[in-house]
Amino acid sequence: AAALVLASEQIITSLFGYGAFGSESVTNTAVALTFFAFGVPAFSILKIFSNFFFARNNTKLPFYLSVVSVIINILISVSLFGKLGFIIIPIATSISSWINVFLYFYFIKKNDLHSFDNKFIYKFTRTLLSVVVMGIILYLLLGFFSDKFNYNESWKFIYLFIIVIISLFSYFLISNFSGAFKFKDIKLK
């Protein structure tokens, strides 16, 4: 999500910024991607939180919470579309998803389905630290490559790929050293 927020314009420019997809289209799409990116952590958390209920054969509560989220999304979108235009759709999606996360969290705590113990908090803070450091590295790399993005149209994708690989590598390295996870814990099948 941090990468999508910081590099949305470079991503959209590199992938779609050619031909009829002009600078205004790139800017509008990049802004929409940025607002959707704020919801990405919520989308991931919702997938995890819903499993607490599915594992206990409780499909009703996730359904009702999803309905509430959709209604909130629609109400925000419809009520503000006239004032803000298309951009309210990704904003409303992210807001309603975060509200849904807090509702899930409330019901998980209320039903005592999970204890957010010290180990969880330790791993979470280390992961957050890794994301922040990766975001700083990404920001610096975007600054370093900014002239190259503007100068050489045909190499934009290559520069973006290099930035993504370095940022991803830094995230995994920092996560490993900070204790968010260990490389030995990763199992590929």
Question: Where are each of the predicted segments found?
Answer:
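Short alpha-helical transmembrane segments in multi-pass integral membrane proteins
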Residues: A1-L6, K83, I87-D112, L128
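Juxtamembrane/transmembrane-helix interface segments of polytopic membrane transporters
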Residues: L4-T13, S77, F81, I89, ...
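Interfacial segments at transmembrane-helix termini and the short loops linking adjacent helices
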Residues: V5-G39, N150-Y151
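Hydrophobic residues within alpha-helical transmembrane segments
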Residues: F35-F38, Y64-I72, I95, I121, ...
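Membrane-interface junctions at transmembrane-helix termini in multi-pass inner-membrane proteins
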Residues: F38-V68, S79, K83
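Alpha-helical transmembrane segments
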Residues: F49-N57, F105-K123, S146-Y151, F181
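Membrane-interface helix-loop junctions in multi-pass transport and translocation proteins
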Residues: K60, V67-F102, G143-I165
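Membrane-proximal transmembrane or re-entrant/amphipathic helices at the cytosolic face
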Residues: S115-F116, L140-K189
